[in-house]
């Protein structure tokens, strides 16, 4: 993107904002925090070719859905849980552009002998998961074990932060996170499996719909694959 910056807005429950420099047309996108690494690459060519000025707000899908319900003016919403968006809100179009799955992650160099889903129940481990109100937490609940969690985080980015800072031994994150963050590694599963999440692009304007279509292009598919996302 032409001039990317990210800041933390505590008043919005830990949302991140990224924007480019001023141009003729402003476009606003709300995006799940798990897209924070890949989305700039996905949008760079579109932004350059169209000349639009894109502002992205990253956060937990529950917080973003609430902002939209309260009337936040946006063009496109990229969510990891479509059920968190009020179905009564009018929209122009909707599509699925990617999928992801959850994985157990540990800090690189961990000596805790963590290797399977049963370790989520181990006494003596410090474990971080997302709160059940956000997609990564909802998916973690579908693993079918009672997780001995020590902390419930507002977004998957918060779980990653706990892991990289060495504050926890084990975290439940998305598979893509272990690819983009070199300080953590996946220990389970070995191959993609559910619980899975689908990323929906919900457009509220014609420009938002155009960007959503760009996200399912062959160019975008190649970028998503590089970051570890699956085809929907």
Range-by-range predicted roles:
Residues 53-62:
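A short beta-strand-loop structural module common to alpha/beta enzyme folds
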Residues 19-49, 62, 66-70, 79-232:
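Exported/periplasmic ABC-transporter solute-binding proteins
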Residues 2-8:
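Sec-dependent signal peptide recognition
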């Amino acid at each position: 993107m032409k001039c990317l910056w990210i800041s933390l807005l505590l008043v919005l429950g830990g949302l991140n904002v990224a924007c480019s420099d001023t141009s003729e047309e402003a476009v606003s996108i709300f995006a799940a925090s798990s897209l924070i690494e890949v989305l700039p690459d996905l949008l760079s060519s579109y932004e350059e070719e169209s000349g639009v000025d894109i502002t992205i707000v990253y956060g937990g899908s529950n917080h973003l859905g609430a902002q939209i319900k309260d009337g936040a003016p946006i063009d496109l919403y990229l969510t990891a849980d479509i059920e968190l968006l009020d179905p009564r809100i009018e929209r122009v179009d909707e599509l699925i552009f990617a999928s992801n799955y959850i994985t157990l992650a540990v800090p690189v160099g961990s000596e805790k002998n963590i290797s399977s889903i049963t370790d989520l129940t181990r006494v003596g481990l410090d474990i971080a998961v997302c709160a059940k109100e956000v997609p990564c937490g909802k998916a973690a609940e579908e693993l079918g074990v009672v997780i001995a969690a020590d902390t419930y985080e507002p977004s998957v980015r918060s779980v990653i932060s706990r892991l990289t800072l060495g504050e926890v031994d084990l975290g439940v994150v998305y598979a893509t996170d272990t690819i983009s963050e070199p300080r953590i590694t996946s220990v389970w599963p070995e191959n993609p499996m559910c619980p899975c999440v689908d990323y929906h692009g919900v457009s509220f304007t014609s420009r938002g719909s155009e960007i959503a279509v760009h996200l399912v292009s062959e160019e975008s598919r190649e970028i998503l694959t590089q970051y570890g996302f699956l085809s929907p």
